[in-house]
C-alpha cells in the first residue's frame, strides 16, 4: 500500500472520532453556510452589474419564445422601473410630470411604486391601504380644500348676470358687462339678487361666472400658465408677464399643487353641465310665470252678440235641431232594420235545426208545438221593431208619411227574411248531410236497421201546421229520408252477405282440423269435436264469430281422460298406485300418436384406441444431402487452403 492511501485512512478515522463532538459540528456548518451565501450574493451582484452596464440589443428578426431567464427573475420590478425612468428623454419627463399633477390618483406615489404583486398576500400591503383610506377623512385635507376654493373665488371676475322678468321675457341688465374681456378687470364680490324668480340662480355665483367666461371664449379671464413643470393660476390682466405672476404667487402655487388638482378638473365639467341646466330652467320658469291673456272678454262679447241678435240665433238653432233629429231618425231606422234582420235569421236557423232533430226522433207533438212557438216569436219580434220605429218618429212629421214608410220597410223586411231563411236552410242542410253520412259509415257494423217511415208522416203533418213557408223544408226532409232508407238497405244487405261468408269460412276451418287429426285420435275424441261443431254453429247464427281449432296436443290430452269407451264423460279414470314391487313398471293409459313418437337411439359403436405412431431407426434413414456450392475460380492457393 502506498503512503497516500495510509494518510487518507488516518484522516477519515480522525474525522469520525471528532464528528461526534457538538462543537466541531457547529463550527463546520456555520462556516460552510456563510461561505455559500457570500458566493451566491457576489455572483448575483456581478450578474446585475453586467446586465446594467452592457444591455443586450434585441435582434429584429428573432423573437423570444423561451420563458424568463434567471437574470430577469433575480432583478425585482422596482429596480426595472428605476432603470426605465433614468433612460427617458426630457420631453417625456415633462409630459409625465404634468400628467401626474393634473390626473393625480387618490393613492400616493410611493405606495404605487412599492406595492408588491397583486396576487401575493402581504400584510404590509393591507396596512398601507388602510392608511391611505384614513387620509381621506383627515382634517388637514379638508382645510386645504377650503383654502383652495377661497383662492379660486378671489381670482375669478364676477360678471353679475342680473335678470328680471317683464311680460314673460328675461332681460340681462348691464350691457357693459356682456363682454367681460373689454370691461375693466376689477375683482368684485358676488351680489345676491332680491327677485323671487331668481332664487335658484343665486346658488354658487362663482361657478356660474367661471362657466360664463369659459363659454364666451374669454381665455384671458382664467390663464393657466404651465412653466417649470408646474400649473399656475393668474388674474385676468393680459399685460402681466408669466414670470412676474409666478414670482408673486409662488406661495399660492405650492398650495395648489399640494391639494388635489383632480377635483378642479372634475368641477369644471360639473359647472358646464349645471350652467346648461340653469339656462333651460330659467327659460321654462319665465314661460310658466308669464301672464296669459284672459279669455273672459271673448265670452262676454259672444254673450252680448247673442242677446242683441236673439231672434236670428233662435231660427238657426231650430233649423239645426230639425236636421239633427232627421239624421237621428234615419240612423235609428237603419240600425233597427239591420238588427231585426240579423236576429230573425239567427232564430230561424236555430229553430230549423231543432225541428229536424225532433223529426228524426219520431215526436209529432213536439214538432207542431215548435212550429207554433216560431210563429209567436216572429210576431213578437215584428211588434218590437215596429214599436221602435214608431218611437223614432216625432210630432212634426205627418201620419201619412209614417204609414207609407212602414209599408215600404215591411216589404223590404219580408224580402230580406226570405233570402236569409233560404241561405240558413241550405247551409244547415249541407252540414247535417255531411254529419249523417259520417255517422252512418260508423254505425254499419254496430247499429241495427231502423225504419224511417214514421219520420215522413211526421214531416207531412208538421208541414200542414206551419204553412206555405215550411213546405220547402218538408220536401227537403222527405228527400233526405228516402236517401237514408236506400243507404241503410244497402248496408243491411252488405252485413248479411258478410255474415254468410264468415259462416262458410268457419265450417271450412273445422273440416280441415278434422282431416289433420290421426285415425286413432278420431275414434276416441270424436264426440268432443261434434259437440264443439254444434256450439260454433249456434254462435254463428246469433251473429258472433267463434273459431275453435283442435290440434294434436288437445287430442293427446283427451285420450288420457277418455280411457275406456264404457266410462262416462266427466269422470276420470283412477290411476294405479305404484308399489315397491312394481317400481320399474309404469301404467300406460293412452297411446302416443305417431307424430309425437321419439326415434330410437342409434347403436353404440365399439371403442377404438388411437393408432400408435411407427418409429423408424435412424440408421435406416437415408443421409441428408450435402450442401452444394458454386465452383470456385481456378486459383491454386485457394485450393491449397481448402
Swiss-Prot record:
Q: Where in the cell is it found?
A: Cytoplasm, Cytoskeleton, Perinuclear theca, Calyx; Cytoplasm, Cytoskeleton, Perinuclear theca
Bias (Basic and acidic residues) ranges: 298-316, 353-364, 428-440, 465-488
State the Gene Ontology BP annotations.
acrosome assembly; cell morphogenesis; maintenance of cell number; single fertilization; spermatogenesis
Q: Where is the composition biased (Acidic residues)?
A: 454-463
Compositional bias segments (type: Basic residues): 317-330, 405-416
Q: Where is the composition biased (Polar residues)?
A: 191-203
GO cellular component entries:
acrosomal matrix; acrosomal membrane; acrosomal vesicle; cytoskeletal calyx; perinuclear theca
| Domain of life the protein comes from | Eukaryota
Q: Which tissues and organs express this gene's product?
A: Testis.
Report residue spans for region: 8 X approximate tandem repeats: 527-543
| sequence repeat ranges per the UniProt record | 294-313, 314-344, 345-391, 392-432, 433-464, 465-500, 501-526, 527-543
* Keywords of the record: Cytoplasm, Cytoskeleton, Developmental protein, Differentiation, Repeat, Spermatogenesis
Give the signal sequence positions. Answer: none
As for what it does, the entry says: Plays a role in the establishment of normal sperm morphology during spermatogenesis and is required for acrosome attachment to the nuclear envelope.
Q: What is this protein called?
A: Cylicin-1
Tell me which species this is from: Mus musculus (Mouse)
The organism that produces this protein has a lineage beginning with: Eukaryota, Metazoa, Chordata, Craniata, Vertebrata
Amino acid at each position: 500500500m502506498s503512503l497516500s492511501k495510509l494518510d487518507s485512512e488516518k484522516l477519515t478515522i480522525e474525522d469520525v472520532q471528532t464528528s461526534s463532538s457538538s462543537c466541531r459540528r457547529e463550527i463546520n456548518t456555520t462556516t460552510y453556510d456563510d461561505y455559500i451565501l457570500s458566493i451566491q450574493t457576489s455572483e448575483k451582484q456581478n450578474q446585475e452589474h453586467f446586465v446594467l452596464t452592457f444591455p443586450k440589443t434585441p435582434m429584429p428578426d428573432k423573437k423570444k419564445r423561451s420563458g424568463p431567464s434567471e437574470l430577469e427573475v433575480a432583478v425585482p420590478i422596482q429596480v426595472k422601473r428605476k432603470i426605465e425612468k433614468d433612460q427617458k428623454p426630457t420631453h417625456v419627463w415633462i409630459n409625465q410630470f404634468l400628467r401626474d399633477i393634473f390626473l393625480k390618483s387618490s393613492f400616493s406615489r410611493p405606495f404605487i411604486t412599492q406595492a408588491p404583486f397583486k396576487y401575493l398576500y402581504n400584510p404590509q400591503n393591507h396596512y398601507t391601504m388602510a392608511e391611505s383610506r384614513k387620509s381621506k377623512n383627515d382634517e388637514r385635507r379638508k382645510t386645504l380644500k377650503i383654502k383652495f376654493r377661497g383662492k379660486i373665488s378671489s381670482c375669478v371676475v364676477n360678471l353679475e348676470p342680473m335678470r328680471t322678468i317683464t311680460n314673460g321675457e328675461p332681460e340681462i341688465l348691464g350691457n357693459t358687462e356682456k363682454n367681460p374681456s373689454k370691461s375693466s378687470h376689477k375683482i368684485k364680490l358676488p351680489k345676491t339678487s332680491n327677485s323671487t324668480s331668481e332664487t335658484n340662480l343665486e346658488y354658487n355665483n362663482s361657478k356660474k361666472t367661471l362657466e360664463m367666461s369659459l363659454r364666451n371664449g374669454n381665455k384671458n379671464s382664467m390663464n393657466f400658465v404651465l412653466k417649470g413643470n408646474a400649473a399656475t393660476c393668474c388674474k385676468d390682466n393680459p399685460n402681466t408677464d408669466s414670470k412676474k405672476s409666478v414670482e408673486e404667487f409662488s406661495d399660492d402655487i405650492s398650495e395648489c399643487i399640494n391639494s388635489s388638482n383632480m377635483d378642479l378638473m372634475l368641477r369644471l365639467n360639473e359647472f358646464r353641465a349645471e350652467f346648461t341646466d340653469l339656462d333651460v330652467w330659467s327659460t321654462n320658469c319665465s314661460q310658466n310665470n308669464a301672464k296669459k291673456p284672459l279669455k273672459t272678454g271673448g265670452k262676454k262679447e259672444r254673450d252680448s252678440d247673442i242677446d242683441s241678435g236673439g231672434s236670428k240665433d233662435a231660427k238657426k238653432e231650430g233649423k239645426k235641431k230639425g236636421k239633427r233629429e232627421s239624421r237621428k231618425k234615419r240612423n235609428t231606422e237603419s240600425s233597427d232594420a239591420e238588427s231585426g234582420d240579423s236576429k230573425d235569421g239567427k232564430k230561424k236557423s236555430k229553430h230549423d235545426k231543432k225541428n229536424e232533430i225532433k223529426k228524426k226522433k219520431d215526436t209529432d207533438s213536439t214538432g207542431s208545438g215548435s212550429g207554433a212557438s216560431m210563429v209567436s216569436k216572429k210576431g213578437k219580434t215584428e211588434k218590437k221593431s215596429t214599436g221602435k220605429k214608431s218611437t223614432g218618429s216625432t210630432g212634426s212629421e205627418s201620419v201619412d208619411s209614417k204609414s207609407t214608410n212602414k209599408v215600404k220597410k215591411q216589404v223590404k223586411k219580408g224580402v230580406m227574411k226570405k233570402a236569409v231563411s233560404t241561405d240558413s236552410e241550405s247551409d244547415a242542410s249541407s252540414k247535417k248531410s255531411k254529419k249523417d253520412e259520417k255517422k252512418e259509415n260508423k254505425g254499419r257494423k254496430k247499429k241495427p236497421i231502423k225504419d224511417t217511415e214514421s219520420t215522413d208522416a211526421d214531416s207531412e203533418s208538421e208541414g200542414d201546421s206551419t204553412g206555405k213557408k215550411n213546405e220547402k223544408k218538408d220536401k227537403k226532409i222527405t228527400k233526405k229520408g228516402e236517401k237514408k232508407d236506400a243507404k241503410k238497405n244497402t248496408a243491411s244487405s252488405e252485413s248479411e252477405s258478410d255474415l254468410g261468408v264468415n259462416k262458410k269460412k268457419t265450417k271450412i276451418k273445422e273440416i280441415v282440423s278434422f282431416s289433420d287429426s290421426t285415425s286413432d285420435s278420431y275414434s276416441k275424441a270424436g264426440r268432443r269435436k261434434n259437440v264443439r261443431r254444434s256450439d260454433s254453429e249456434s254462435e254463428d247464427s246469433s251473429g258472433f264469430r267463434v273459431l275453435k281449432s283442435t290440434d294434436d296436443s288437445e287430442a293427446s290430452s283427451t285420450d288420457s281422460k277418455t280411457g275406456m269407451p264404457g266410462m262416462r264423460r266427466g269422470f276420470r279414470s283412477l290411476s294405479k298406485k305404484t308399489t315397491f314391487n312394481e317400481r320399474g313398471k309404469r301404467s300406460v293409459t293412452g297411446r302416443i300418436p305417431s307424430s309425437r313418437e321419439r326415434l330410437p337411439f342409434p347403436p353404440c359403436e365399439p371403442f377404438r384406441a388411437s393408432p400408435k405412431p411407427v418409429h423408424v431407426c435412424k440408421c435406416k434413414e437415408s443421409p441428408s444431402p450435402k450442401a452444394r456450392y458454386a465452383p470456385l475460380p481456378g486459383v491454386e492457393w485457394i485450393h491449397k487452403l481448402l
